[in-house]
């Protein structure tokens, strides 16, 4: 794989993580709607009609359940992807370069934080990263994107 393809493969976890985070936020909003109080609409004319005896949160329950199932599935996929990426990073066989890749692609650290943690100059961390990317071996069946 090329340098850019390997970086894209390792970056998949970040985007999957963001998707899970987004689903959690959607679920939180739905739960907030279900648990919130309903307002009165004064714009419509008052018409005598039969009142619904269903609780107002009932209409959100199905949506919440579907979103929870989707979230559960995405979390499972996220954990599997994380394991795959850990395996790929482990193929580098150099502890410092593995740390650079782990900090960057699993922990989502900024370059300056990685350099500070490892007590290296940021430019040297870039050099280690470039070399580590070239050493990563990705299984054929793992090459999804």
Language-model features: where?
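DNA major-groove recognition helices of helix-turn-helix
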Residues: 85, 125-136
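N-terminal interaction/assembly modules
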Residues: 1-91, 138-145
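Short amphipathic alpha helix immediately N-terminal
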Residues: 93-107
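N-terminal positioning helix adjacent to the helix-turn-helix/winged-helix DNA-binding module
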Residues: 81-84, 95-97, 128
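Short alpha-helical "recognition helix" segments of helix-turn-helix
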Residues: 113-116
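Short coil/turn residues that cap or connect secondary-structure elements
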Residues: 89, 93-96, 124
